[in-house]
Amino acid sequence: CTDKYAEVRDIYFPYVGLENHIGGHFSHRVGAYVDGQLNWFTHSNWRIDSNFQDSALAGETLAQNGALGVKIKLNDSVYNEKNIFLREVTVTNDSDRARTVKIFFNHEFEIYESHRGDTAYFDPIHHAVIHYNGKRVFLINGVSDHGGFDDYTTGIFKIEGKEGSFKDAEDGLLAKNLIEHGPSDSVLGFYLNLAPHESKTFYYWIAVAESIKEARDLNAYVLERRPGHLVRSTRDYWHAWVNKYDFNFYGLKKEEISLF
């Protein structure tokens, strides 16, 4: 689940409620770097509104930053057939001039609910970042109109006086550190060249599995089927599930019905 800043706070696998591989106290940050300034979603410059999509088990977040002149819309869902968390990300340049907007995703895992023994590394063959510990594997990837993610790094956090790899994004460039062991984290960057008031959409996902091979197979599945198709099919599935019975709500208000 995500919090009020659209940060993923809980990832349960292999069961709902067991095990939590973020623990609720670490962060999967989202931020934007524009014109030499980085604002994570926790920054006071952001105005963030989150909701559920109507008749769908999917989250929708609109984040607006007047200081940066950027708007970001996130549509979040878990694919209904496989263990894949999907994010459809639409970025709008609200400025009157063309700019490069960089979107960063930071990942702090506590795999097996233990702050030791984890590994994070960049897989150059599949162009993905993988976090793993034993039979718990988290493959992170994404795709935009010009290919995969543009930048990456791995590191360690909350140990040896290091805050975490999210600090590496502050200058708008990542160190491309290939691998780390221990309490490891990572950052992915997507770089968008946007004309004045232009919007572009890209996709980001986390495939969760019990082996690296299985995670790579899930990643190949997303690329083959296209992430946009998976987002739409998941929305359609839940819409059909919610509406398979014709309920009589006996005059309840629309807001009350939507809670149901």
Ranges and model annotations:
Residues 33-35, 104-108, 205-209:
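Predominantly extracellular/luminal cell-surface or secreted proteins
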